[in-house]
């Protein structure tokens, strides 16, 4: 922890650090000259004049302002370390993109969503270096080239056509101006601390300002003859190139009203340059929308189509993103009552907001005879939407009883229409003794329409537009022996980083709500209490079946006594034992399971104390960029004979995809090394992991390839499309995501998991206990055939394994039967050992020789063996099938379902 009172001001004209880096070889315009040099082959002589519209003045002030921005860009680039290929992008579709290592990742490895450390963002002042600009990606970054990229203008226009990038640059007037971009989820983690939203944890740095150059949208639409309002032209829709899983596979798209698009005062541009360079891949290369004063979600990147329509965009992301619904509406209610489609809740313009950036999180201000003789300067940023000027920022040290008006710094001048498109900065000198007597600092801003920020947080299901007073808490501490100081705490830290006063208060609230009864833990010698604190190193020691601890949302649970009762088998717990498995737990467990977890809580995770090298170290004292470096990974051998590594996710590349039927696909994924086998025991399964709509999604699958295949594994997957089954209108989240994957895409795989393992020659290991059978009654429903198929494969591959198999396989229709060709082939070639019987609810084909309806006692009696000490039943299918068809009918036949039925 930095203990310093050098209250340094980072204004936009401050001299840069004495540091320089060589320009990248692929970036000839590293110096950010305006316009870029001809050597880039980027811009030919334009047919219309390029003009700068920074302000309303008509004199040399424009040139002065342009030069000032240029100096800021040069200064920022000179202080910035080069972007690199981040090891965290290895195995993802974004592995070709260079990124700044200090960006804080908010959604794991992929997709890339990030914000800079708040102190680094503020260090650069008004203009943000492009590598530090926050990033919001819904999926992989599309690849494209300048020469091949086209944008289509269509819909209600007289002359629909496509234009190239060279045409955009050379045949249209351009405009260049600084614009602040803000994600509507800025400060969302504060909302997640109150109640979890459906969004990930943005901190307070989802905001950046750069200089954008592009063609005014109104000029483009005029050129192509946009129709009038009377002829139905009411909206302008934008569609990107990125193919995303939402809605069963769709492009990112949204729309704005046509009067916005045609309003010259709104300065809406189709941008192709940022800070004097071509757009970076993460920011929309080669072309994107910039809509000043609007939320970032309306500014479509990698734009491919502009459509003038009567109706607003029908994109999944236009309706299911960027809405502020009333606080009582949760995700379930929003879906059942169609709240997403109510136009009054859409977000367009930004709201008024302000943040305290100095003091930074965990900064310490020593209290002594010297520091108390000079004021301390509080600092921060503020912005508003719609071009409205921030006119006042106020700070309170007494909970809102009194307010002090801050000094404002507006580095931009208004446009000729009086608009302000950028953030501003505020500062206030306060007496140190006043800070010592206060408990918190709070800030609020006002804009020219006299809108201000609410005192209290207003929760909404998407966690959007949080703009309550930003509060920094203060506590007295002892940074050194014989010395006292004030330690400052921000409300949260971005992403999954620990820290912040809201996290502490949440833990205290949960502890107060915990039941008073004490529960004895099997694996720990003490009584369980919610208040006991453990370090991460202590948790890591409990990673075995003898003592299995897990961390979920900062709470520590001893799951040892639940190992034998877990529906997915002990492997499902042990694969995460000794780790923080918050994301994975939330991805695969219901609310009921989350409530059951509380019984096993033994304490809380001890967060990092106040140290000078913490992530939020003060920018006022000595700091090093090393604090932003990712942990150095331990070197491991590059080649392994087995791909799966317990407790780790491995990236696997999609190398082949075949359509077996309209809704069945066979996927082949390459393992990390060509000489590896997957390493999945027969009978167990793997998890496929993907971030879909900003949340981790994990689903269990059993490969259909044999266990000894080298270099790859295969999955046969039924795709559950949206709008097909009335009970599941959105379809299957993971199966639709898989169907949308392009060849070359990567997917994370984790395993092995499961409580059943077939060891050959009729031997099974179930929950660690041996079982044996000469005959197997194999009952499957739908996609539940895959683990049964896997066991059959292993048996038939071993010439010494003479286990008999009797398969009853249920589906809705004949077309839903998976792997039928393979099953029928085995039954035909080895009829004495393999018998297969199908059950379908409805048959539309003539000559159907199998059963109709549902699995019944009569069907089972006819097609599976009678119970005996050498007979086991294996079952996999939907829970209702197991509960209402398999269990009762096997019991009627005399099976001991507790001992002789194995359910995958």
From Swiss-Prot:
Q: Which InterPro entries match?
A: Cbr1-like_FAD-bd_dom (IPR008333), Cyt_B5-like_heme/steroid-bd (IPR001199), Cyt_B5-like_heme/steroid_sf (IPR036400), Cyt_B5_heme-BS (IPR018506), FAD-bd_FR_type (IPR017927), Flavoprot_Pyr_Nucl_cyt_Rdtase (IPR001709), FNR_nucleotide-bd (IPR039261), Ig_E-set (IPR014756)
Could you tell me the Gene Ontology terms of the biological process aspect for this record? nitrate assimilation; nitric oxide biosynthetic process
Could you tell me what the cofactor note in this record states? Binds 1 FAD per subunit. Binds 1 heme group per subunit.
Q: Name one Pfam family in it.
A: NAD_binding_1
Region Disordered: what ranges? 1-65
Q: Where is the composition biased (Polar residues)?
A: 1-10, 39-50
Known catalytic reactions: nitrite + NAD(+) + H2O = nitrate + NADH + H(+)
Q: Which SUPFAM superfamilies match?
A: Cytochrome b5-like heme/steroid binding domain, E set domains, Ferredoxin reductase-like, C-terminal NADP-linked domain, Oxidoreductase molybdopterin-binding domain, Riboflavin synthase domain-like
Residue intervals of the FAD-binding FR-type domain:
647-759
**Cofactor needs:** FAD; heme; Mo-molybdopterin
Give its E.C. classification number.
Answer: 1.7.1.1
Instruction: Cite the record's Acidic residues compositional bias ranges.
Output: 56-65
At the top level, the lineage of the source is Eukaryota
Which Gene Ontology molecular-function terms are recorded? FAD binding; heme binding; molybdenum ion binding; molybdopterin cofactor binding; nitrate reductase (NADH) activity; nitrate reductase (NADPH) activity
Keywords of the record: Disulfide bond, FAD, Flavoprotein, Heme, Iron, Metal-binding, Molybdenum, NAD, Nitrate assimilation, Oxidoreductase
Q: How is its activity regulated?
A: Regulated by the nitrogen source and controlled by the circadian rhythm.
**Binding-site positions, Mo-molybdopterin:** 183
Family stated for the protein in its record: Belongs to the nitrate reductase family.
> What does the record give as the function of this protein?
Nitrate reductase is a key enzyme involved in the first step of nitrate assimilation in plants, fungi and bacteria.
Q: What is this protein called?
A: Nitrate reductase [NADH] 1
Tell me what organism the protein belongs to.
Nicotiana tabacum
Taxonomy, top ranks, is:
Eukaryota, Viridiplantae, Streptophyta, Embryophyta, Tracheophyta
């Amino acid at each position: 922890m930095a203990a310093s009172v050098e209250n340094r001001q980072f204004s936009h004209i401050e001299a840069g650090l004495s540091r320089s880096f060589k320009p990248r070889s692929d970036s000839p315009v590293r110096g950010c000259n305006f316009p870029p040099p001809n050597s880039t082959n980027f811009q030919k002589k334009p047919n219309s004049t390029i003009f700068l519209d920074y302000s309303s003045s008509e004199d040399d002030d424009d040139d002065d302002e342009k030069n000032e921005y240029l100096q800021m860009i040069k200064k920022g680039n000179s202080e910035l370390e080069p972007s690199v290929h981040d090891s965290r992008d290895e195995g993802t579709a974004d592995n070709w993109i260079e990124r700044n290592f200090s960006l804080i990742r908010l959604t794991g490895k992929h997709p890339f969503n990030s914000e800079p450390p708040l102190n680094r963002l503020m260090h650069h002042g008004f203009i943000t270096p492009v590598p530090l600009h926050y990033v919001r990606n819904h999926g992989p970054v599309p690849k494209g080239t300048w020469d091949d990229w086209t944008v289509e203008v269509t819909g209600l226009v007289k002359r629909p056509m496509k234009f190239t990038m060279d045409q955009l640059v050379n045949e249209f007037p351009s405009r260049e101006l600084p614009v602040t971009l803000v994600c509507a989820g800025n400060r969302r983690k504060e909302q997640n601390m109150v109640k979890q939203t459906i969004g990930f944890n943005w901190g307070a740095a989802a905001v950046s300002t750069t200089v954008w150059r592009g063609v005014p949208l109104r000029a483009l639409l005029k050129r192509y003859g946009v129709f009038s309002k009377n002829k139905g032209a009411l909206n302008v829709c934008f569609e990107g190139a990125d193919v995303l899983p939402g809605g069963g596979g769709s492009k990112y798209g949204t729309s704005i009203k046509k009067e916005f698009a045609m309003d010259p005062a709104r300065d809406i541009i189709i941008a192709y340059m940022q800070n004097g360079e071509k757009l970076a891949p993460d920011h929309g290369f080669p072309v994107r929308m910039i809509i000043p004063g609007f939320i970032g979600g309306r500014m479509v990147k990698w734009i491919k189509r502009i459509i003038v329509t009567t109706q607003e965009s029908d994109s999944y992301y236009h309706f299911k993103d960027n809405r502020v619904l009333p606080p009582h509406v949760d995700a379930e209610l929003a879906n059942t009552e169609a709240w997403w489609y109510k136009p009054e809740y859409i977000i367009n313009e930004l709201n008024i907001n302000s943040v305290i950036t100095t003091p930074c999180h965990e900064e310490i201000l020593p209290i002594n005879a010297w520091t108390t003789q000079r004021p301390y300067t509080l600092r921060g940023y503020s912005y508003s939407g719609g071009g409205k000027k921030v006119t006042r920022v106020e700070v309170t040290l007494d909970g809102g009883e009194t307010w002090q008006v801050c000094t404002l710094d507006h580095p931009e001048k208004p446009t000729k229409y009086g608009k302000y498109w950028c953030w501003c900065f505020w500062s206030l000198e306060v007496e140190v003794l006043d800070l010592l007597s206060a408990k918190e600092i709070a800030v609020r801003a006002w804009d020219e329409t006299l809108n201000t920020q609410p005192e209290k947080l207003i929760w909404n299901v998407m966690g959007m537009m949080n703009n309550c007073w930003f509060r920094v808490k203060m506590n007295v501490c002892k940074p050194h022996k014989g010395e006292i100081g004030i330690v400052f705490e921000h409300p949260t830290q971005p992403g999954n980083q620990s820290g912040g006063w809201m996290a502490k208060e949440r833990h205290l609230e949960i502890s107060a709500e915990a039941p008073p009864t004490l529960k004895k833990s099997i694996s720990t010698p003490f009584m369980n209490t919610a208040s006991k604190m453990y370090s991460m190193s202590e948790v890591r020691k409990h990673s075995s079946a003898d003592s299995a601890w897990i961390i979920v949302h900062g709470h520590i649970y001893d799951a040892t006594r639940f190992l034998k009762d877990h529906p997915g088998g002990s492997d499902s717990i042990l694969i995460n034992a000794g780790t923080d498995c918050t994301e994975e737990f939330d991805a695969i467990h219901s609310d009921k399971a989350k409530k059951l977890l509380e019984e096993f809580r033994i304490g809380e995770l001890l967060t990092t104390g106040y140290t000078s090298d913490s992530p939020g170290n003060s920018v006022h004292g000595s700091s090093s960029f090393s604090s932003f470096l990712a942990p150095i990974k331990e070197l491991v051998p590059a080649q392994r004979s087995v791909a799966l590594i317990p407790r780790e996710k491995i990236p696997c590349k999609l190398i082949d995809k075949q359509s077996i039927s309209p809704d069945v696909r066979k996927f082949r994924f390459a393992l990390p090394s060509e000489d590896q086998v997957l390493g999945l025991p027969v009978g167990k399964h793997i998890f496929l992991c993907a971030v879909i709509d900003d949340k981790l999604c994990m689903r269990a699958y059993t490969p259909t390839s044999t266990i000894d295949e080298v270099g790859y594994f295969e999955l046969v997957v039924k795709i559950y499309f949206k709008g097909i089954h009335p009970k599941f209108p959105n379809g299957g989240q993971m199966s639709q995501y898989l169907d949308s994957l392009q060849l070359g895409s990567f997917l994370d795989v984790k395993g092995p998991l499961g409580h059943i393992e077939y060891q050959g020659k009729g031997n099974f290991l179930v929950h660690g206990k041996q079982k044996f059978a000469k005959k197997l009654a194999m009952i499957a429903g739908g996609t539940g055939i895959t683990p049964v198929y896997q066991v059959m494969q292993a048996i038939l591959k071993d010439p010494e394994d003479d286990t008999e198999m009797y398969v009853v396989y249920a589906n809705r229709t004949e077309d839903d039967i998976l792997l039928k060709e393979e099953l029928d082939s085995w039954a035909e070639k080895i009829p004495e050992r393999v018998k297969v019987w199908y059950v379908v609810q409805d048959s539309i084909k003539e000559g159907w020789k199998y059963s109709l309806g549902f699995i019944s006692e009569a069907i089972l009696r006819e097609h599976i063996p009678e119970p005996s000490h050498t007979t086991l039943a294996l079952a996999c299918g939907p829970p209702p099938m197991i509960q209402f068809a398999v269990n009762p009918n096997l019991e009627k036949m005399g099976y001991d379902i507790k001992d002789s039925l194995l359910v995958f």
